[in-house]
Amino acid sequence: MLSRPRLSAYAAFAAELDAKDPDFTTITVFTDKEETGSDGNTGMQSLFLKDFIEDFVSAYGLSARHVLMKSVCLSADVNAAVDPAFGEAFERNNCSYLNRGPVVSKYTGSGGKYSTNDASAETMGFIRTILEKAEVPWQVGELGRVDNGGGGTIAAYISTHNLDTVDIGVPVLSMHAPLEITSKADVYLLYKAILAFYMSPMAKE
């Protein structure tokens, strides 16, 4: 077990480094201030991503908005694992557990689907197919019982660019507590999941 600071960034960075000759262009973006609104020029609400892609694709005579619409994004962020000490806060059949692989979340947010991205069934199927073909163990989970707390991710901001986005991350025991616990196996499998996504020959339809 290990503590979780920057686990998602580590897994994504390691996968980007190991993605040799992918069929499609891969981009890994690191942002901060996620816990305080994702504001500022280094938060996900900045124009950096769109401006970067616009500059990048214009050299090929392409439109940034068309490239974004044809892309798929994994928003790497942790998810709350079922805590046996606070079982009433979780819907056990819809939440994640340690040592079962990364969590793929159709939606996060609080109060049901408030302040969230809601991935389409087609996008969920696209990611599921990639992970299953790569034989990467994974699980589906939500951030606690509906209408009982919860939290959002930057997927809500990414998806405003008409970019299909899905949350994925390791489950965390006691998220936001002074001591958080994750599984090294889940961290490794998150790396494998992101690498499989980067290296997949599948194109979005």
Locate each region found by the language model:
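Active-site-adjacent substrate-binding region
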Residues: 79-86, 90-179
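Acidic/histidine-rich catalytic neighborhood of metal-dependent amide-processing enzymes
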Residues: 10-103, 150, 202-205
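Short amphipathic alpha-helical face segments that pack within enzyme cores
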Residues: 7-15, 126, 189-192
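His/Asp/Glu-rich mid-to-C-terminal helical/loop segments that flank catalytic regions of hydrolases
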Residues: 16-28, 170-205
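A short glycine/serine-rich beta->alpha loop
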Residues: 1-3, 34-39, 112
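Generic hydrophobic alpha-helical scaffold/packing signal
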Residues: 53-57, 128, 195-198
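Phosphate/oxyanion-binding active-site loops and adjacent basic polyanion-contact surfaces
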Residues: 4-9, 49, 119, 190
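Short, conserved micro-motifs enriched in small and acidic residues
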Residues: 2-10, 181-184
